[in-house]
């Protein structure tokens, strides 16, 4: 079994060594320009077109949970990968726990009004504030995939009312499920904290705009953990300035790194992190990839395959 690996920043030697330990019968090599030798599987992130074009691969693994970048390249270069070759994304591989940590910590930060207390500290004001109740602090999750399910599971322990919005109906215990555009308004109307975990598709680009934000309760919060292109940044800032939104926490942006001239840097009710909410953890990724390749070789059912038409 031949496996090729390409990632512009990862330590290729470590990955090659770890994969060969996990798959003793495999020969793994870092792909370099000019390497046209046969391969059965490819592990990639932002691969050059020539790496995959013309290869008779059994499968390709994208080294991340999001596949919008590679799908965009495939759409621009259909010759890059035959439509019959399955494409897999990393399923969880430690990202679920990271998303749980991030989402729970931020929801609790807002629920306990730590942002308000920080603002009072900056004014040297000692002023206890009225508490929020859990009943009025409903959390709505847009996107009900693997990571959305993990976030909902972690928030349940804290007793917040939970709801999710997705393409298909979910039957998660303790979570109200809303489906499609026809149920979006009902989902938003009672959502105090909106958590975005949607995939990046043509249908979801720009979805968090003034029309959507206007349907949230006054004083709502937005937590974006998915993709920057989901948010119309000017609309978000307008909602913050008007008081419609009380705060926003952003991990992703339409342009990364975020330009220094962006007003998001200076807005007092915007907090941000540099796209670190959930990063690929190599050991967990190796475990998932080696397990999935073994299942594929045995003809067993697998999970994590990308539906190219849907975009996730």
Curated annotation (Swiss-Prot):
Gene3D superfamilies: NAD(P)-binding Rossmann-like Domain. Its EC number is 1.1.1.79, 1.1.1.81. It comes from the Bacteria. Keywords: Cytoplasm, NAD, NADP, Oxidoreductase. GO terms for cellular component: cytoplasm. Its main location: cytoplasm. It is found in: Cytoplasm. GO terms for molecular function: glyoxylate reductase (NADPH) activity; hydroxypyruvate reductase (NADH) activity; hydroxypyruvate reductase (NADPH) activity; NAD binding. It catalyses: glycolate + NADP(+) = glyoxylate + NADPH + H(+); (R)-glycerate + NAD(+) = 3-hydroxypyruvate + NADH + H(+); (R)-glycerate + NADP(+) = 3-hydroxypyruvate + NADPH + H(+). The active site is at 227, 275 (proton donor). The keyword NADP applies. PANTHER family: 2-HACID_DH_C DOMAIN-CONTAINING PROTEIN, D-ISOMER SPECIFIC 2-HYDROXYACID DEHYDROGENASE NAD-BINDING DOMAIN-CONTAINING PROTEIN. Belongs to the D-isomer specific 2-hydroxyacid dehydrogenase family. GhrA subfamily. Catalyzes the NADPH-dependent reduction of glyoxylate and hydroxypyruvate into glycolate and glycerate, respectively. This is Glyoxylate/hydroxypyruvate reductase A. It comes from Salmonella heidelberg (strain SL476). The gene is ghrA.
